């Protein structure tokens, strides 16, 4: 099974936005693992489909869907596409894993995946991520110095 995490560029209110809908690719559809979707969704404290509309125009998992279909063709495993919002609305000064509701959800989700692995299922976590967008092209008026690059890299690695 594949858990695909992508950036939710529109940053909906939900920290993670799941969808049970398949992703269409030129190589065929990426099917959702419905029992796993239900197990993951049941561990969240909110409706994970509340912001499902974010999947419609989001590009952060499109390449991953095509890549998975290309690699495995007819044997492509089912997946769970999850868009990840900004966590700053929950806390601007703490790591997301230290926010109580997020910490509990991460532990619960980890337990669901561990249970699947204990049943002999292979688990792949695939990230479609963006790193820092800095510079004039992104509206910044600052000079990109080696010191700033090191700081940005450090922030990207958190």
Regions found by a protein language model. Give the residues of each.
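Active-site histidine-anchored catalytic micro-motif
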Residues: 1-158
């Amino acid at each position: 099974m594949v858990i695909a995490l992508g950036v939710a560029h529109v940053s909906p209110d939900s920290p993670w936005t799941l969808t049970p809908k398949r992703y269409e690719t030129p190589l065929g559809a990426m099917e959702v693992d419905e029992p796993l979707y239900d197990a993951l969704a049941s561990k969240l404290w909110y409706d994970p489909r509340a912001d499902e509309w974010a999947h419609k125009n989001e590009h952060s998992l499109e390449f991953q869907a095509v890549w998975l279909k290309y690699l495995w063709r007819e044997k492509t495993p089912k997946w769970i596409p999850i868009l990840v919002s900004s966590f700053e609305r929950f806390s601007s000064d703490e790591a997301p894993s230290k926010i109580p509701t997020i910490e509990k959800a991460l532990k619960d989700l980890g337990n669901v995946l561990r249970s699947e692995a204990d049943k002999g299922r292979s688990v792949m976590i695939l990230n479609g991520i963006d790193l820092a967008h800095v510079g004039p092209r992104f509206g910044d008026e600052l000079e990109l110095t080696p010191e700033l690059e090191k700081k940005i890299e450090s922030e990207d690695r958190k």
